[in-house]
Amino acid sequence: MAAAGGLPASATLLLLVIAAVAVAPLASAVRPVSDAHRSAAAELFAASPDGSFGDLETTYEAVRTFQILGVEKDKGLIGKACKFAAEKLASSSSSPAKDLFHAARISGVLKCSVDSGVYDDVATRLKAVIKDTNSLLELYYSVGGLLSIKEQGHNVVLPDADNTFHAIKALSQSDGRWRYDTNSAESSTFAAGIALEALSAVISLADSEVDSSMIAVVKNDIVKLFDTIKSYDDGTFYFDEKHVDAAEYKGPITTSASVVRGVTSFAAVASGKLNIPGEKILGLAKFFLGIGLPGSAKDCFNQIESLSFLENNRVFVPLVLSLPSKVFSLTSKDQLKVEVTTVFGSAAPPLRVNLVQVLGSDSKVITTETKELQFDLDNNVHYLDIAPLKIDVGKYSLVFEISLQEQEHETIYATGGTNTEAIFVTGLIKVDKAEIGISDNDAGTVESVQKIDLQKDTSVSLSANHLQKLRLSFQLSTPLGKTFKPHQVFLKLKHDESKVEHLFVVPGSARQFKIVLDFLGLVEKFYYLSGRYDLELAVGDAAMENSFLRALGHIELDLPEAPEKAPKPPAQAVDPFSKFGPKKEISHIFRSPEKRPPKELSFAFTGLTLLPIVGFLIGLMRLGVNLKNFPSLPAPAAFASLFHAGIGAVLLLYVLFWIKLDLFTTLKYLSFLGVFLVFVGHRALSYLSSTSAKQKTA
């Protein structure tokens, strides 16, 4: 029994998610080429902002991959690729054979319009390279370029084909591999592939038949080459280098692709059939399909082009058995469906698919009864009901046997005989005989036992002290009644006040799952925290369709006081996003208004306020008001009128301040009126002063 304290609340859910999705690795899924490969190719071979794919080699790999997959590209990109290839073909004689080789192949794939005179010049240059070189790569690029020009409808003949054939064959080794040139000490499997492809081009370009004895020798070399092939236990075959420098090492994908191109190209032009076992051709197809979606443009090209050569070749056409789904539900009564197609998903010839053996996860034989799968012609799928197989939840290996119905197809197609596929079966797990209770520590006498239903949340209420134990037990059984042991079974206790959590693994035996928590030994792990603990049970497994996280109720624990040096409960993690949540609402009550004075007092105060104005008016009446000194000239009269109007405006602003305006607004208006009054008042008073001075002097 293990305990863990202070885990976050999401820990149990995380464990259940892991249990639900962590299906043990099945055999690598082998599925035909699909739209997913087309999408991956379009992404991996993305054109740069200027519309190009890079150098000539990358451009050819892009357009060739798109051609095989049927991916439509923008006409502008095609035009730029054609222009790129045409410029290289028409360039000076200094262009290497490699560039001419790729440019000619780009032109062939895109059907670019190239002048016949340009091709004649390129052919002459490539033939000159063939005469002067002993390099396998130079010979490969030269004869490959000539073959590409010929395939575009131009008359190209290799006049000395036998000598070229012998020059390439002279670089072969006794184990079926090739050297890159006469000075190379090491041989290469990758070089063997390009050598075979070059030899097939020589045969196609020859103006007469190549020596049949030399072709027979090359066929024997191919058999030796396939003796060096490597394999996995699932029937996958691949080629890899043995002893080459790090700079020359290509990797299994590139090396296998080179051999597939070379062997299928040579088989297409050589008379007779190559003596290669069909299971090895099928294994190579499984290798390239097992890559899935490649991660680089180079791997994508090698995968797709190799599969295109295997799709239609004169050795054997591989037929791939695949399962659309490898997970089956006993609850839904899913059917076992099997597809047998070519690597690109084309329909297979008439055949039978039999299920001959079912193996358990421990390789134990479940059944050996042969069952023939029915064929659905409309959907091109073979199917079988899994209920009669009497298989339970878990992992199984199914062994299928494929047999062609027509004998002549056995020399054309490779089925591999038997094929093993891993599947995973799920179902509803029965949960019963669940009990929870408290027992004494010494005698083990159960004080209270409650039967609970784990198919739904329960609300048991228990109480215990540190001298007692908590007991929980239940049974799990599969749809066929066998004991089921899930990957994850946990009991969680969560302290209500401190939120500290404790997880315990619930051990299982052959009959039941049972856990006993002895609180006397757990007081320190519980940090001596008494109080209410919520109980939760988590049961999860990938094969269990009804995995659950179930609330059981709570238990009141009475634990002793913590000693002085006892460990403190861990601080609970603070959610960093909690500060962005809603804030606490602030409640504020304004104070009650002051008690207002009586009306009579208010009226009396108002009267006293108006008393100075009344006195002012009485004074004016006693003294008398006259306009004798009011200016008579137009300009001074205007300034005097504006001055009095400004004073009136100030008085009006004063009234508005008490009625409507605030202090800041009033001061703003008053500042403008003050400047106005100073100006017009100064002009009016200046006129009166000058008039008074004139009267005194007169």
Swiss-Prot record:
| Bilayer topology annotation | Multi-pass membrane protein
Residues assigned to the Lumenal compartment are 30-600, 660
Cell cycle: present as a keyword of the record? no
| UniProt keyword Endoplasmic reticulum present | yes
Q: Can you tell which superkingdom this protein's organism belongs to? A: Eukaryota
Q: Where in the cell is it found?
A: Endoplasmic reticulum membrane
GO annotation terms (biological process): protein N-linked glycosylation; response to cold
Which of the residues are on side Cytoplasmic? Answer: 622-638, 682-698
Query: What Pfam families does this protein's entry cite?
Result: Ribophorin_II, Ribophorin_II_2nd, Ribophorin_II_3rd, Ribophorin_II_C
Could you name the Gene Ontology cellular component terms for this entry?
Answer: oligosaccharyltransferase complex
Principal subcellular localisation of the protein: endoplasmic reticulum
* Keywords assigned: Endoplasmic reticulum, Membrane, Signal, Transmembrane, Transmembrane helix
Its signal peptide is 1-29
Q: In which pathway does it act?
A: Protein modification; protein glycosylation
Q: Which residues cross the membrane?
A: 601-621, 639-659, 661-681
Q: What does this protein do?
A: Subunit of the oligosaccharyl transferase (OST) complex that catalyzes the initial transfer of a defined glycan (Glc(3)Man(9)GlcNAc(2) in eukaryotes) from the lipid carrier dolichol-pyrophosphate to an asparagine residue within an Asn-X-Ser/Thr consensus motif in nascent polypeptide chains, the first step in protein N-glycosylation. N-glycosylation occurs cotranslationally and the complex associates with the Sec61 complex at the channel-forming translocon complex that mediates protein translocation across the endoplasmic reticulum (ER). All subunits are required for a maximal enzyme activity.
Partners and quaternary state?
A: Component of the oligosaccharyltransferase (OST) complex.
Query: What's the family?
Result: Belongs to the SWP1 family.
Q: What is this protein called?
A: Dolichyl-diphosphooligosaccharide--protein glycosyltransferase subunit 2
Name of the encoding gene: RPN2
